[in-house]
Amino acid sequence: MSVKWEKQEGNVGKLTFDIEQEKVKEGLDRAFVKVRKTLNVPGFRKGKVPRQIFNQRFGEEALYQDALDILLPEVYSQAIDEAGIDPVDTPQVNIESMEKGETWVLTAEVTVKPEVKLGDYKGLEVEKRETELTTEELEAELKQLQERQAELVVKEDAPAENGDTVILDFEGFKDGVAFEGGQAENHSLELGSGQFIPGFEEKLVGLKAGDEADIELTFPEEYHAEDLAGQPVVFKVKLHEIKTKEVPALDDELAKDIDEEVETLDELKEKISKRLQEAKEESVAQAKQEEVIAKAVENAEVDIPHAMVHHEADHLMNHFAQDLQAQGLTPELYYQFTGQTEEAMHAQMETDAEKRVKMNLVLEAIAEAENIEPTEEAIDEEISTLAEKYGMEKDAVRAALGDMSELKSDLKIRKAIDVLLDSAVEK
């Protein structure tokens, strides 16, 4: 096989390769076997026409396209290996020469993985974050748990305050006319929750059960309903009932209500402290990793082909559709509810995709610069982890992973991240 790679502008180049006569003959033979199965020729049973008769009747050229379809995956793969290039998309292959009895010559305009010019990636400064759980953090968590056990009790002859829950009727009017979506009866609203437009909840503070009021407001300029955005309106409201939170005492009894596995408040505090400490350490480690990766990526230079970004955006769109499906929705319903289009969503995904692509390219380049190669022990350990996670036999996991290229790439990237973290300087 003759292969020629001509680098052009950016990440694109022209790949010229051929299929030698002997290989062409093999492809034609395989194509004839495929075509003959469905061929009807008078005087012969279906699928039994001899090759010579086929050539006389249709010409050998009738097999060329099928032969090319059969041979192309193999010869293209061989050509890119010999050229030493790493394509990032499937190119359009053009036929330069396809003469009977001669070598076939093909060309393809190929977009390849870009070269990464690494900047500083070792000894990067990162923020020193506190990992020790504070008393304030523990108390805040206990307070949240305490408030979750609170009960709402009716407030008798007392004005509504922030934090109270009111039961009310309301109807909104613009220029004296009720507008769509502005009416409800016996609606439950926690004051201070920010569920309504600015000013609505604040003007309910101080009212008592049985009170009626007209609340004058202006919708925010960025409100989603264009006919109401920035417009003055009046809400007629009537309060039926006010409820306040009755928070239980933080004691042993409450501790047992919160967690049936503990007997005392001290036991609950110890259990929560351990959980919060682990979560904080994990959060700090994640923040450090994200910061050091972001700095290494920022310091690197790379011209990312749009094909890579588009492919990654497609991948993100597929994940998005799967997440919606898990919630019982479809992309079509989501677009209908939100007023967004698939094209706009894909464009939004491309922004995230470009960041992800650059990050992966930089981490791969760091792995290469550090001569990182996963050991057989590391590969076997990862396979064991996957087998346990998905309840599969190790051999089944190996079979599913195929040539292990994706697994090896993941392990390389993890090791590259370790290089960044191990050399990072906390300040």
Swiss-Prot record:
PROSITE patterns for this protein: FKBP_PPIASE
Keyword set includes Ribonucleoprotein: no
Domain of life the protein comes from: Bacteria
Keywords: Cell cycle, Cell division, Chaperone, Cytoplasm, Isomerase, Rotamase
Domain PPIase FKBP-type: 163-248
Compartment annotation: Cytoplasm
GO CC field: cytoplasm
Known EC number: 5.2.1.8
Gene3D superfamilies named among the record's database cross-references: 3.10.50.40, Trigger factor ribosome-binding domain, Trigger factor, C-terminal domain
Its job: Involved in protein export. Acts as a chaperone by maintaining the newly synthesized protein in an open conformation. Functions as a peptidyl-prolyl cis-trans isomerase.
Family from the record: Belongs to the FKBP-type PPIase family. Tig subfamily.
Comment block on domains: Consists of 3 domains; the N-terminus binds the ribosome, the middle domain has PPIase activity, while the C-terminus has intrinsic chaperone activity on its own.
PANTHER family: TRIGGER FACTOR CHAPERONE AND PEPTIDYL-PROLYL CIS/TRANS ISOMERASE, TRIGGER FACTOR-LIKE PROTEIN TIG, CHLOROPLASTIC
Protein name stated in the entry: Trigger factor
Gene source species: Listeria welshimeri serovar 6b (strain ATCC 35897 / DSM 20650 / CCUG 15529 / CIP 8149 / NCTC 11857 / SLCC 5334 / V8)
